[in-house]
Every structure is written in C-alpha cells, then in structure tokens.
Amino acid sequence: MAEAGKHTTVLLQEAVEALALKPDGIYVDGTFGRGGHSRLILERLGKNGRLIAFDRDPVACAVGRSFGDERFCMVHSSYSRLQEVLRQLNIGQIDGVLLDLGVSSPQLEEATRGFSFSMEGPLDMRMDTTEGQTAAQWLASASEVQLEEVIKEYGEERFAKQIARAIVKARARQPLVTTSQLAAIVAAAIPARAREPKQNPATRTFQAIRIYLNQELERLSLALPQCVEMLKTGGRLVVISFHSLEDRIVKRFIREGANTDKLPKHLPLRADEVRRFSRASLQMVGKAVRPGVAEVECNPRARSAVMRVAERINTT
C-alpha cells in the first residue's frame, strides 16, 4: 500500500517512456506535484537537456526549488500559462509535455488543505493557497441554483438538488467552515439506499467544489492547444487523467487534432486554406493506458487513472 502522506506517482515509468525522451531535449512537466515524474525525466536527460516544471501549489514549488539542478526550472504557475511562460524563458519549441492531472496524495492527506472529506480541516480546497476564494467563502455566498449546477456538472452527482438545498439550510443555521460539516450535510442529503458501495457519499460533491474553485477543466482546455502549438514535429503530449470529465476533454482534443477530414464542403478555397483545413496537428500514439493490477494494489488511487499520448505532426 502507498505510504500515508507520501505521493506515489501514478504510471511513472509508462508516462516518462511515452515522452520518448531525447537526451538534449526540452521538456515540460505541467503538474510537478512532488516531483516523481520530474526526477525520472532528469535522470534520463543528458547534460544539455532542460526541464521546466509548473505547479500552482507553493509547497510543491518549494520541493522543486530544492532540486539544485541547473537543467531544471520550477515555475509557480498554472500550466494554462505554458505558452506565455515559455516565451518569457526564451524557449521556442519543446520536445514533450506531461500533464498528470488532479490532486496529489499530500494535498489530500494534509488536513489543513481542506481537500479530504475523511479528515477534519478548514474548507479551503485551493490548489494555490496564495489566491482565490476558499470553499468556505464560496459555500457562504453561492445561490442554491449555483450550488446545484456546480455539484451536478463537476461532480456528476444525481442528488445535486437535494445537496444544494441542504447546504443552504445548514448555512442559515451556522457558517460552514470545516470539511466534516460539509461531509455530514452531504451524507444526510443522499438516501442510504442510493449510496454507491465503497464510496463516501461526499466524494462527488468534494470533487465538484474542488474542480470548480480551481477552474481545473477550464485550465485544461486552455492548456491543450498551447501544448500542441509549442511542440516540435515529433514532440509528445502525455496526459494522465483521473475522472471522466478530464478524460473526455483530452480524448476529444486528441481525436479532433488527429482528424484529417476537416475540409468544408462546397466552398472555394485557396491553397493555403486547403493546407490549413486538411492537415492534422496530432496523431494518437497507441491506445489509452491504465495502471496494472499490481500498481492499483500498491496505490488504490491509481485505479481511475487513464493515460493518453499524442504526437505533433505537420508544424509547417
């Protein structure tokens, strides 16, 4: 089993191998976390290789800055600013980018971060604790309609209406400031007979609030086109997602990028327009990869992981 408080990197070998590393290449780890993927990438890069890592979490950035490797640059920022940051660093194009989405084990297991429904802590849930509103602040001000929409859309929770109503009633009695308060409210709002086996009833609601507050899906949608724009021909995009909302975005993006049937019908086009519409920007590399039985047994959080890989083509 994974050690509590320690982040066990999911699909570590598979993800780094999927990057098809060149010793002198330039790579981006868009979600540094606790540096599992970055460490292995650096081990395999040559002396002239470079790795730029992004993370919104100040604690993660502190870990990265302790590396002491001149080939490595730690950036306190969302990967959704990838293109802007790389240009600031005078980097033209890159050989590969890795995105390991979601929340890390240390974030979940640090009670003060407020991500976990199983630990008593303040309702925070921010990836970047230096900016933005906390979960407690949002829960205090959101309308019942907004609560329902967020829980339904980002948590895919069929009892979103009942949960939203329960939150509004509860906050009228006292402020909602702790994870245990919210978890209890959600649990009480879901009929016992409708609860999913082996899943805490608060799972989907906590996921929804976290995704909404941190704009996780919006940032992913912003980042993917930037990744492709910055990749050299033959460069790899590797994305590990942990729930269907993320994976849907990644799968659709890669599929659309690989689609060569983009010519508008019955329209006269110039030669440059024909090239622009007919050329794919990506090709899929293999099938989706999931953790094996042994990895899931050692790290149950790996169970829902899905890795998709694409390669940049036709950059001219």
Swiss-Prot record:
Broad class of the protein's primary localization: cytoplasm
One Gene Ontology cellular component: cytoplasm
Highest taxon listed in the record's lineage: Bacteria
Gene Ontology MF, one: rRNA (cytosine-N4-)-methyltransferase activity
Catalytic activity field: cytidine(1402) in 16S rRNA + S-adenosyl-L-methionine = N(4)-methylcytidine(1402) in 16S rRNA + S-adenosyl-L-homocysteine + H(+)
NCBIfam families registered for this protein in UniProt: 16S rRNA (cytosine(1402)-N(4))-methyltransferase RsmH
Organism, scientific name: Nitrosospira multiformis (strain ATCC 25196 / NCIMB 11849 / C 71)
Compartment(s) of residence: Cytoplasm
Function: Specifically methylates the N4 position of cytidine in position 1402 (C1402) of 16S rRNA.
Name under which the protein is recorded: Ribosomal RNA small subunit methyltransferase H
The keyword Methyltransferase is assigned to this record: yes
EC number(s) stated in the UniProt entry for this protein: 2.1.1.199
Family: Belongs to the methyltransferase superfamily. RsmH family.
UniProt-listed GO biological process terms: rRNA base methylation
One Pfam family recorded for the sequence: Methyltransf_5
Alphabetically ordered keywords of this record: Cytoplasm, Methyltransferase, rRNA processing, S-adenosyl-L-methionine, Transferase
